[in-house]
Regions:
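Hydrophobic transmembrane alpha-helical segments in integral membrane proteins
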Residues: 1-14, 124-127
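Alpha-helical hydrophobic membrane-insertion segments
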Residues: 36-44, 48, 140
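Primarily extracytoplasmic/secreted proteins
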Residues: 10, 15-19, 39-43
Length: 174
């Protein structure tokens, strides 16, 4: 049960980070609610494919790239080359942050790297670390790649950090 909740949490944080990144770097092509609904639909398909592929890493990376591309192309003002570049960039950052999370947890607890997939609590801890790093990376990269060099209010984007820390609190309570 905790593993499924964590997986849904992972996809929601990835969607939120992607939309925040795209909103800061590109202009919105459609209205924000329709872009959000499109993103939720894309990530629902992504979640289903992830479940059918039994959380296969290669399928996860490839399909994550495709979902990022579709959201960038349909929901935001990105041309094909830019959408491909940013999709590859975000897929690479996501892979790197997940690998860092796995290495940190396996090093801290002295366990095999593959054990996090069979232990729901370790999986949740890896998810919290990886998604926090992913969100921070998206915010930092969007500061450098934003087309508009005007002042951007950073206050609201940091509210997304509440979710990883609150999930750690919930895990501790369980």
């Amino acid at each position: 049960m905790l593993g499924e909740v964590t997986t849904v949490y992972v996809f929601l944080i990835e969607l939120g980070s992607l939309l925040l990144y795209c909103y800061r770097v590109f202009g919105v092509r459609r209205r924000i609610p329709s872009t959000l609904l499109m993103g939720i639909a894309c990530f629902a398909v992504y979640y289903a494919v992830n479940k059918l592929a039994d959380n296969n890493v290669a399928v996860n990376i490839i399909f994550g790239f495709l979902v990022n591309y579709v959201i960038l192309k349909l929901g935001f003002k990105a041309n094909v080359k830019t959408a491909v570049f940013h999709s590859v960039l975000l897929a690479g950052v996501l892979t790197a942050t997940e690998f860092i999370g796995i290495l940190l947890i396996s090093g801290f607890f002295g366990i095999n790297i593959a054990d996090y997939r069979s232990n729901d609590v370790l999986y949740a801890m890896v998810a919290v670390i990886a998604k926090t790093l992913y969100l921070i990376s998206c915010l930092v990269i969007s500061n450098f790649t934003s087309r508009e060099k005007q002042h951007i209010d950073h206050g609201h984007s940091w509210y997304l950090l509440i979710s990883p820390f609150s999930s750690v609190y919930i895990i501790v309570l369980i």
